[in-house]
Amino acid sequence: MSFGSEHYLCSASSYRKVFGDGSRLSARLSGPGASGSFRSQSLSRSNVASTAACSSASSLGLGLAYRRLPASDGLDLSQAAARTNEYKIIRTNEKEQLQGLNDRFAVFIEKVHQLETQNRALEAELAALRQRHAEPSRVGELFQRELRELRAQLEEASSARAQALLERDGLAEEVQRLRARCEEESRGREGAERALKAQQRDVDGATLARLDLEKKVESLLDELAFVRQVHDEEVAELLATLQASSQAAAEVDVAVAKPDLTSALREIRAQYESLAAKNLQSAEEWYKSKFANLNEQAARSTEAIRASREEIHEYRRQLQARTIEIEGLRGANESLERQILELEERHSAEVAGYQDSIGQLESDLRNTKSEMARHLREYQDLLNVKMALDIEIAAYRKLLEGEETRFSTSGLSISGLNPLPNPSYLLPPRILSSTTSKVSSAGLSLKKEEEEEEEEEEGASKEVTKKTSKVGESFEETLEETVVSTKKTEKSTIEEITTSSSQKM
């Protein structure tokens, strides 16, 4: 059995025997929880594992070939040296592959450190975002408190406005009442003026009547003087006539007729004088009564005029006071209406400002929510990448542990089968001694050794297969546990972030 046939048989069949179907392992590793990078490198890990398994199997085959070398009589030193060189080359390739795997492992560890640093930075940024998200809540509390204060001020202004409206309505009613009273007083004043005019006409009539009576009195006095003068003249004429008649009678009967004529004249004079006195007294009494009546009427008219003038003056004073009061109330009403308009404009401006502030805060809140959602998505992506890298690191760790276990078991089996420490130096004397000592019994011993070596090879391959299957099963179990734990951690982290963000909202 040559080295080339063993190598190619290992590359084709030992991979399926040890690790099973590579597509099944790759599909199992590239599950729904892993990322694209892990799926792209699952084939490389299976290829590396298959290469390492083939290398170990080929080294085992080399050991077995070295075990078979002493039994072959036709093997020369050149072939042994070539196989030794091939073995060295294979070992060198294996070392280079292990070095490359170690370098890749170091790169992945550095990448994990970088991702942990980024994770810490993102956690710090998330804490800052939470703090920033908590600050708008305090701003909202301040805004709500200020809004409550402004609402209280608005309610006070509304109550003051309602009170002012009530006062305005009361003042309007008072103005209406005063206006009605003013109109009533105006009507009373007009009636008093009309009465005054009527009284004035009566006074004028009384004055004219008094003047007429005075003229009548004067005419009566003149007539009385004229009557007295006429009476005196008539008396004088009668006296003269009486004297003439008395003289004529005296001549007839002076002694008898003289006393009777004197007494008759005396009686006539007394009658005329009493009649004139009665007429004069009656005229004076009528004049005095008329004059007293006219004076009384004039006094009453003067008193009524004075009272009317005083009442008119009082009405004018009250009207002026009510007019001044109405003007003051009108000015107060206008000032209150201006204040109400100013308060309404100020309230509208403040409400518009608060609406703008509310809109700005809502836009900031939406921006913060969108930014938080973006950071959550980035954090989710980073968690997915971290989970994939953790799975990949665990897979590489299990692969390295399995390779170390397999190399240790392979080294023990090779050392048990071939106890020589350095086959490159000890192989030629061993081959020479075996070829010189056992030339005669080469055929039978070669068959027996081949059968024994085949049995040992089958046992070693079965043992390696069992160990590799155990390593693969433990790797798959660890991988599934890592995926489940990572999903649980990610789900709990997302739920915690969502709960905290919803509570803060």
From Swiss-Prot:
It comes from Rattus norvegicus (Rat). Keywords: Acetylation, Coiled coil, Developmental protein, Differentiation, Glycoprotein, Intermediate filament, Neurogenesis, Phosphoprotein. One of its GO terms (biological process) is intermediate filament organization. Residues 263-408 are annotated as: Coil 2. GO terms for molecular function: protein-containing complex binding; structural constituent of postsynaptic intermediate filament cytoskeleton. Belongs to the intermediate filament family. PANTHER family: ALPHA-INTERNEXIN (PTHR45652:SF18), GLIAL FIBRILLARY ACIDIC PROTEIN (PTHR45652). Residues 143-238 are annotated as: Coil 1B. Expressed in the dorsal root ganglion neurons (at protein level). The modification Phosphoserine is found at residues 72, 219, 335, 474, 502. Residues 239-262 are annotated as: Linker 2. This is Alpha-internexin. Residues 94-407 form the IF rod domain. O-glycosylated. GO terms for cellular component: cytoplasmic ribonucleoprotein granule; glutamatergic synapse; intermediate filament; neurofilament; postsynapse; postsynaptic density, intracellular component; postsynaptic intermediate filament cytoskeleton; Schaffer collateral - CA1 synapse. Forms homodimers (in vitro). Forms heterodimers with NEFL, NEFM or NEFH (in vitro).
